C-alpha cells in the first residue's frame, strides 16, 4: 500500500522511482555496467584507505585527507547504487518512505562533506607549497582532525536541513519520482504542501557550501600557481605541479557536474540529461578518484609497488 489516510492528509509509505529507462534490454546493460563500476569504486577506495594506513611514507596530512575522501566516496556511491541495481531487476521500482529519507540524507551528507574535503585538500596544498617552513605547524595533527571534524559537522548540518524539510512535506499522490533516487528537487515537485521556504533555505545552504568551498579552492590554487611560477628549479616546479594535478582533476570533475545541475538554468537541459549527469557525479566520479590519485601521484605509486613487491616475493 502506497498511502495511509489520516484525517484530511495522506501519509505516504512508499515512492515509485521511474529510474533511467523502461527498456528491459537496456536495463540489463546498465545493470552490468553500473555493477562493475560499483565494485571498482568500493575496491579502489578501500585499497586507497588500506594503502595509506599501512604505508608509513604516506602518513602525511594530504593522504590523511585523501583517506577520508575515499571513505566518503564509498558512502556517496553506496547511498544510491545498491538500490539502483536492485531496481534494474524488477518491473516496479519502489522505495519506502524511510528508505527515501535515508537515501536523501546520506547523499546530501556525503556530497557536502566531499565539497569541504576538496577545499581542505586545496588549503593543504597551499600551505605545503606556499609556506613549506610553517607547514608542519599549520597542518599539525590537531589542525587536521579539526578540519575533518568540521567537514563532517558541515555535512551533517546541511543534510539535516534537507531531511527535516522532507519530513514536513505532505504528498497527495501519485508519488512517482522522475529520477533513479530520492533527490530533493523531484520530491519538492511532488509535494502538495507549501515548499517555498524549504526551497529557499536548502538552496541557500547548498549554494553557500558550494560557493565558499569553490572560493577556497580558487584562492588556494591562485597562490599556488604564483608560487610555482616564481620557482627557479625546474625539478621543484615539476614536483609541485605533480602533487596538484590529481587534486585539480578531481575538483574539476566534481564541481563541473555540480555546476551543470545546480547552477545552470533548468530550462537549458532536460530531466534525462539531469539523470545522466547525476549518475556521473554520484556513481562514476567516486570510481575515478582513486584512479586519478594513484595514477598521477608518484608517492602512492611507489608505496603500491613496494607493498606489491613484498607480497610477491614474501
Curated annotation (Swiss-Prot):
Which cysteines are cross-linked by disulfides?
100-192
InterPro entries according to UniProt:
GPCR_Rhodpsn, GPCR_Rhodpsn_7TM, Olfact_rcpt
- Tell me which UniProt keywords the record has, alphabetically: Cell membrane, Disulfide bond, G-protein coupled receptor, Glycoprotein, Membrane, Olfaction, Receptor, Sensory transduction, Transducer, Transmembrane, Transmembrane helix
Cytoplasmic-facing ranges: 50-57, 124-136, 221-240, 296-314
Tell me the membrane topology, using the record's own terms: Multi-pass membrane protein
Glycosites = 8
Domain of life, source organism: Eukaryota
Q: Does the keyword NAD apply?
A: no
Carries keyword Membrane? yes
List the subcellular locations. Answer: Cell membrane
Gene Ontology cellular component?
membrane; plasma membrane
Q: Which residues are listed as membrane-spanning?
A: 29-49, 58-78, 103-123, 137-157, 200-220, 241-261, 275-295
Tell me one GO molecular function of this protein: G protein-coupled receptor activity
Task: Show which residues sit on the Extracellular side of the membrane.
Answer: 1-28, 79-102, 158-199, 262-274
One record GO biological process: G protein-coupled receptor signaling pathway
Which family does this protein fall into?
Belongs to the G-protein coupled receptor 1 family.
Q: According to its UniProt entry, what is the function of this protein?
A: Potential odorant receptor.
Question: What is this protein's name?
Answer: Olfactory receptor 5P68
Species this chain originates from: Mus musculus
Amino acid at each position: 500500500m502506497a498511502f495511509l489516510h489520516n484525517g484530511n492528509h495522506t501519509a505516504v509509505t512508499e515512492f515509485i522511482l521511474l529510474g533511467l529507462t523502461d527498456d528491459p534490454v537496456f536495463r540489463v546493460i546498465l545493470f552490468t555496467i553500473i555493477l562493475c563500476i560499483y565494485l571498482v569504486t568500493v575496491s579502489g577506495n578501500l585499497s586507497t584507505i588500506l594503502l595509506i594506513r599501512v604505508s608509513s611514507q604516506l602518513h602525511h596530512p594530504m593522504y590523511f585527507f585523501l583517506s577520508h575522501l575515499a571513505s566518503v566516496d564509498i558512502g556517496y556511491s553506496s547511498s544510491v547504487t545498491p538500490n539502483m541495481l536492485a531496481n534494474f531487476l524488477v518491473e516496479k521500482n519502489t522505495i519506502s518512505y524511510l528508505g527515501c529519507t535515508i537515501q536523501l540524507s546520506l547523499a546530501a551528507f556525503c556530497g557536502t562533506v566531499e565539497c569541504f574535503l576538496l577545499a581542505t585538500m586545496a588549503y593543504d596544498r597551499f600551505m605545503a607549497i606556499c609556506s613549506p617552513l610553517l607547514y608542519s605547524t599549520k597542518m599539525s595533527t590537531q589542525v587536521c582532525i579539526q578540519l575533518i571534524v568540521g567537514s563532517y559537522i558541515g555535512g551533517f548540518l546541511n543534510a539535516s536541513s534537507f531531511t527535516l524539510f522532507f519530513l514536513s512535506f505532505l504528498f497527495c499522490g501519485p508519488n512517482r519520482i522522475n529520477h533513479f533516487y530520492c533527490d530533493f528537487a523531484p520530491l519538492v515537485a511532488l509535494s502538495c504542501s507549501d515548499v517555498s521556504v524549504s526551497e529557499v533555505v536548502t538552496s541557500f545552504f547548498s549554494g553557500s557550501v558550494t560557493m565558499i568551498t569553490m572560493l577556497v579552492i580558487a584562492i588556494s590554487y591562485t597562490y599556488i600557481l604564483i608560487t610555482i611560477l616564481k620557482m627557479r628549479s625546474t625539478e621543484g616546479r615539476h614536483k609541485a605541479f605533480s602533487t596538484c594535478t590529481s587534486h585539480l582533476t578531481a575538483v574539476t570533475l566534481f564541481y563541473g557536474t555540480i555546476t551543470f545541475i545546480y547552477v545552470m538554468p533548468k530550462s537549458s537541459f532536460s530531466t534525462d540529461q539531469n539523470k545522466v549527469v547525476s549518475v556521473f557525479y554520484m556513481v562514476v566520479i567516486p570510481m575515478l578518484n582513486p584512479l586519478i590519485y594513484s595514477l598521477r601521484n608518484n608517492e602512492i605509486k611507489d608505496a603500491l609497488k613496494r607493498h606489491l613487491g613484498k607480497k610477491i616475493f614474501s
